[in-house]
């Protein structure tokens, strides 16, 4: 059975649709709970989520890694599925995850698609079918057995950015990782707010700085300097 964990901070515009899509596309009723791990939203995120009858935990520490770990600590099922608040899984996602786990994959993700049509974004998404770490990000969602999640110590809370890169690298050392060839649908809002090509350039710059060993503080300061941030 699956526990879905969604980290949130001021996501009132997206959270209801994401929750509803999860329930709707869980065709075999494998999702037993949705846990909203909120980082202290000042809008109606919690109110919107409460209206959908999901579990809500208010995290003592804000930050995606810390919130996902905190949400996972409340999970009651053997499979954890981490989904961003502005990302919706594909139809039949839960059975796809179950099939992957039963086939010996202890962790994995889906391909990516955006809610805005642009040739560059489509090309970007096409490459997410390949198992290349440079194009593996949290927007693609992440499923993992609770056992393996705990074995790697969860998300590294020192990682303010690229926490998904870190945990996937750790998981690949101890388990088989797969990419399910169906796309999640995620918001293109950062691309539209900052410019598609500029945003992609920023993402790759931050990734390569990460690979070169720059500190999280340097990555975050560079990111915030270059991109318009409404929430973080």
What are these regions (language model features)?
Residues 6, 19-20, 30-40, 57:
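Short beta-strand/loop segment that forms part of the nucleotide-sugar
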Residues 11-26:
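Short, well-formed alpha-helical segments that are part of the catalytic scaffolds
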Residues 38-46, 87:
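A conserved acidic beta->alpha catalytic loop
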Residues 59-75:
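Glycine-rich, basic loop-to-helix element that forms the pyrophosphate-binding segment
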Residues 80:
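Short aromatic/hydrophobic "clamp" motif used to bind/position activated sugar donors
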Residues 91-119:
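Conserved donor NDP-sugar-binding/catalytic core segment of glycosyltransferases
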Residues 161-167:
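Acidic donor-binding loop at a coil-to-helix junction in glycosyltransferase catalytic cores
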Residues 172-232:
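Hydrophobic helical membrane-anchoring modules
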